[in-house]
Amino acid sequence: MEKFYIITNDMKDANRKITVKIKKCIESYGKKCYLEERPEEGNFSKIKIPKDIDCVLTVGGDGTFIQASRRLFGRDLPMLGINMGTLGYLTEVEVQNVEEAVKQLVEGNYTIEERMMLYGSAAYRNVRDVALNDIVMTRSGSMKIVHFNLYVNGEFLNSYGFYCVQSVCRRTDCGADSVIDCCDTDLLACTQFPQYCFRGQR
């Protein structure tokens, strides 16, 4: 790997202290490293990632990693997440271990774990998108119920039109809930979320 690109969530690394540290560490090995410019608004940039990049690093939490994976859809680029969030089930490296992680990267001491992604579309609104973790179909109004047909790879799977169902989630083994029930398989789960009303007891 010769060229690296760092995507930073400025809500997590506000002064980019960790980001700059990673950049300097990469450059100390004679490699090139580019930092994504701060977005004009929001946490995530819409800038296209250069084509000649060999590896993308994210600095933030799992949300930063997931957002970056969507932007990289269709490109065969490895990603490594530096965890500055809370859970960190996708971001592999903790902040205190970044220098060792960079050393392993530039020396080629790593393995690449393939991840599947979902492609989803809503035909009636012509909406299409991709996801690393899950796609959720949910109602748009407080008094509306979910009613739709679900197709997977062009084949009809199920109809949803029940009052008790608030939304349906189609997820990969990268989803947070899937860490528990998928056990490193390619299992896809389609889960109904019932509508509950929780009230505090006095």
Located regions from the model:
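ATP/NTP phosphate-donor binding region
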Residues: 1-55, 95-111, 122-129
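Redox-cofactor binding/interface segments in oxidoreductases and associated redox assembly factors
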Residues: 6, 58, 167
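A residue-level signal for conserved active-site and pocket-lining positions in enzyme catalytic cores
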Residues: 9, 57, 61, 83, ...
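Short glycine-rich anion-binding loops that position phosphate/pyrophosphate groups of nucleotides
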Residues: 11, 62-64, 87, 171-172
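Gly/Ser-rich helix-loop-strand patches that form or flank binding pockets
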Residues: 67, 72-85
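Catalytic core of DAGKc-family lipid kinases
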Residues: 87-162
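Gly/Ser/Thr-rich active-site loops/lids in small-molecule metabolic enzymes
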Residues: 158-200
